[in-house]
Amino acid sequence: NYAYLTMIDKVSSWKFAEDFATEPEHIKQARFRAEQLGVETITPATGAQLAFIVSAIGAKTAVEAGTGAGVSSLWLLEGSEKLILTTIDSEPEYQNVAKQTFQEAGLDSSRVRAMSGDAHRVMANMADAAYDLVFIDAEDQDIDDHLHSASRLLRPGGVVAFAHALFRDRVPDPAIRDEATANFRSAV
């Protein structure tokens, strides 16, 4: 049965990719804090991919919508020692944990600007065409708003990246038509 074997291959491939990525100790500590808070994080392989993108495009400035405990922030910053990150989260508790994470990771405070508030509202007050990368790890109902903001914030040639872009394998399935999946599908 081809479909069954394809699914096995997919699971094996994902496991291989996830097991292949190594995570620095400071990011492991951030992941532990996120688990304690009940905050979903990106996987180590996704983090490594984000760091690669930052490096590949030579990003100097980035915006992150959805700080959480700082796991994805740290991965973005792994991509370049020159990156300046503005990270936004609506949960002050998460921001406080992330700030502690950044401090314990030894990051210079000039590299990270952590802002509390609704990401869409905060991004509305940020400079146009001033960022090389926008990473969106936010609630699914906000994806369209964040994509619109990202397109305004990005310099020509800038990159927008989404956490969970395939929305837990729902986006490729045309039979799934709920609003959240449709939002991700249109964004991708």
Region roles according to the model:
Residues 2-59, 63:
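Class I SAM-dependent transferase core
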Residues 40-120:
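SAM cofactor-binding core of SAM-dependent methyltransferases
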Residues 47, 139-142:
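Short beta->alpha connector loops
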Residues 88, 117, 136-138, 157, ...:
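Active-site flanking residues adjacent to catalytic metal/cofactor-binding acidic residues
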Residues 125-134:
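A short acidic, Gly/Pro-enriched loop at the edge of an enzyme's catalytic core
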Residues 142-188:
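C-terminal substrate-binding/active-site "lid" region of AdoMet-derived donor-dependent transferases
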